[in-house]
Amino acid sequence: MGRVAAGICGARGLGHRPAGDGGAAGGKPYFPACPQVHFSVSHTRTAALVAVSAAPVGADVEQVRPLYPAMARRLAQADCGDLQPFELWTLRESWFKLTGAGDLRTIPFRRADGVLVPPEAGALCRVYGDIPGCVAAVCSLAEQPPERLQFVPPREICT
């Protein structure tokens, strides 16, 4: 996935390769020549998601599929409003990638009156359903995630 991140960042003019030697907090990959650029990478069988930001960011994408009962129980949360299981899953994963904190089984997200309520005041999170067959989420503590995802053609990534 580092190649995907490098390809997308190169296509966007950043031209830097990420390093995965643990120099960033929690061993997270980073761009040594451009430390002010933050990114988060996720993939599933059918999609890859790379979030690039001027502030720390967490992103996750999951392919929607039937849930085993044990997984459904793991995702259960008493007060999550109308969040669907994969929305909750991707939000929790993206939050964990952003902060490195919390228990993936219990990170508290909910939707109240149509508004996403993240686990920490001031956090900015968004759920995306525009990747066919997938759900994605992005979380930040400083920048509002974009309203829509920007799709990058594979030929721009793999050249």
Model-based region annotation:
Residues M1-T159:
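Core catalytic alpha/beta fold that binds nucleotide/phospho-ligands
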